[in-house]
Curated annotation (Swiss-Prot):
Protein name: Alanine--tRNA ligase
Organism of this sequence: Bacillus cereus (strain ZK / E33L)
Keyword Oxidoreductase: no
Record remark: domains: Consists of three domains; the N-terminal catalytic domain, the editing domain and the C-terminal C-Ala domain. The editing domain removes incorrectly charged amino acids, while the C-Ala domain, along with tRNA(Ala), serves as a bridge to cooperatively bring together the editing and aminoacylation centers thus stimulating deacylation of misacylated tRNAs.
Gene that this polypeptide is encoded by: alaS
GO cellular component, one term: cytosol
Keyword 4Fe-4S attached: no
InterPro entries, A to Z: aa-tRNA-synth_II/BPL/LPL (IPR045864), Ala-tRNA-lgiase_IIc (IPR002318), Ala-tRNA-ligase_IIc_anticod-bd (IPR018162), Ala-tRNA-synth_IIc_core (IPR018165), Ala-tRNA-synth_IIc_N (IPR018164), Ala-tRNA_ligase (IPR050058), Ala_tRNA_ligase_euk/bac (IPR023033), DHHA1_dom (IPR003156)
Amino acid sequence: MKQLTGAQIRQMFLDFFQEKGHAVEPSASLVPHEDPSLLWINSGVATLKKYFDGRVIPQNPRITNAQKSIRTNDIENVGKTARHHTFFEMLGNFSIGDYFKEEAITWAWEFLTSDKWIGFDKELLSVTIHPEDEEAFTIWNEKMGVPKERIIRLEENFWDIGEGPSGPNTEIFYDRGEAYGNDFSDPELYPGGENERYLEVWNLVFSQFNHNPDGSYTPLPKKNIDTGMGLERMTSIVQDVPTNFDTDLFMPMIGATETISGEKYRNGDLEKDMAFKVIADHIRTVTFAVGDGALPSNEGRGYVLRRLLRRAVRYSKKLNINRPFMFELVPVVGEVMKDFYPEVLEKKDFIAKVVKNEEERFHETLHDGEAILAEVIAKAKEEKTTVISGVDAFRLYDTYGFPIELTEEYAEEAGMTVDHEGFENEMEKQRERARAARQDVDSMQVQGGVLGEVKVASEFVGYGTVATESNVVALVKNGEYTDSLQVGEEGQLMLDVTPFYAESGGQIADRGYLLADGVKVLVKDVQKAPNGQNLHKVVVEEGTLTKDAAVKAIIDTKNRSSVVKNHTATHLLHQALKDVLGTHVNQAGSLVTSERLRFDFSHFGQVQADELEKIERIVNEKIWESIDVEISQKAIEEAKEMGAMALFGEKYGDVVRVVQVGDYSLELCGGCHVDNTASIGIFKIVAESGIGAGTRRIEAVTGKSAYELMNDQVGLLKEAAGKMKTNPKDILTRVDGLFAEVKQLQKENESLAAKLSNIEAGNLTDSVMTVDGVNVLAAKVNVADMNNLRTMMDDLKNKLESAVVVLASVNDDKVNILAGVTKDLISQGYHAGKLVKEVASRCGGGGGGRPDMAQAGGKNPAQVEEALAFVQEYVKSVSK
């Protein structure tokens, strides 16, 4: 067998299928673009759904890729098994209605066994097929020469996700030899069984049937191929190592961790070996995910990253690492993956900063968790139990990130145990919630629809013209071809030549009219058809529109003018964000309309007011410099060498359109732009907000919209100045004066309230009753808020020295209740928190707190007197 690195295997796979006429699809971002069904890209086929479901017709129906992927449904097994990972690469070859079983099997066999490629010994390979797939059996047996005894028929070899495309699959297994299993009495020791000897290296799915709603299967009009080979597993076989973690894809991270910890991998300690594996796996996942724009948080993708980092930190303690260190592994990951993913090294400083910040936070969290755990232990002792409940242990784990193992250690020190079964029950409930929320990757939807059949040419000329003579080359109504559209009817059409821009890259579509003799057609929207033509959504306002009609296509120039101002402004904004916030900023989405622009970008904190001011000023300065906007066509490699920014979620061909604003901004973009920045006029930021973990949004306006916004704001300023009887330029001074007056009045009010409270407290001492030898005061008082209630409580406790006091006040139909117990009575079992909870429950509320002071609220003012009457009963119950 050849000696190959993981990087060489990846490149060899892509080169092989490129030789077989496949287009190499770049590895997409781990953060799905326009696919809400996925938390992460989790397979090679996930990024190709648009081709399989017919929304987009690929230029080449043969596709190959090496797709980075994340799966987190089995995190707890990572490190325990030889091949569980959260981050992995899936190598695949795909056919969209082109070749089928014979080619897929033949090429897989060639790649695996040819000396030019991997060069496996054919005798060490076995395959599994579906019992009824005689076609696959014949190809394997007669064409590939695989003997019958190494072709295993298994019922589970059928790919089916319910309604939609489905079909049999065949899997290829490699025999690693007797060192990995030689007990042939083991019922699982066969290719396809649960064993370490026969490893699956490749899965070929033959999508040939449609699973109908009635449960029947019918042949698909177009048959597809979807294959997957895990790079990590393949590398472990080629490099002849026991687990994926022992390959050159993981060992550099393990080696770096050895250096940091002073511990050794594979030194006879299985727990420490597991820690090395967990750290190596999780830092790969976090590094790539952060590089693709995800950031740690308490929800969604961010929660996954936070959980992975915290799990790795917890395992690092087994290696005696008690400081932030994971960030030091980020450049190691970058070096391992630099051949295919150079962007990791390019972003290593930012990624390391994010990881270090999260590590530091978790070390603080561990400290906080210890405090919460101390409260849990105290509560358990108070309830006279030696078991920490599974609910409490899970809350510590899930909310505070406090590992169950640490909870058990602390519990043992306190002479207690943890309800592990209860904890696992809570974990299973969480898994059930996750399973319920998870959606299967529906990569191949039902085929059909006439738009995918339309192959006529349609040229977009809208960059240089706003009106053109054209012909209707395709006309569709209600999803079917039609020869005409009558007045009031809606439909879709294609033109042989069109000035109408189809919505893409965040820029909305043009609108306008198609005109002919006696015919007027409103163009409401324009989208890309499956084969790439501009598809116009129209409604006939006058006359009858027929297929092949000659029309004049005219866009709404006023609308386009506003759109291009906003689009060029987004390019200036993008660069300004990088200048002010840092090079880690990447576009995460945009919307360019005629009214405003919206720009989403990656950033791990709120943009401060002074930063926003700098960003806005930079954009306006570039507008006022009257910079020419130059647009050119470049080879993709040349454009990248120039430093052009490729945008989020976009796919680019060999030749790209480059939009350059002087020497300031350089981006790949297919949208429409101004000729000179001066046309934008002015740029004004309207809002900045967070829209998700690590993603911020800026909304802004330009030109006329910016003028109208600022004019409205100046008008409001003048109106406010008038009401305060001052000039706009003096309004801040006037506001400061008013605030000072209000503050002084508040002080006087508080002083007066305190005096009144003291007087009322003095009067209340006459209402003190003695219950079983305890001074008790329960009274409804007339105070404004809880602060005044606390002041009165302090006065009463000082005056009475030993007492149980409960005060209630009513304001705006809301009840405030405060309970206080002096120190001498706390030791006798009196507890303000328990008391106030009982009182509040009797007037429709709840609350709690410390033994000496506790507060609550109620919703039923009419029941306050009755609730206060309970205080005497409480004192009697404790004194017994």
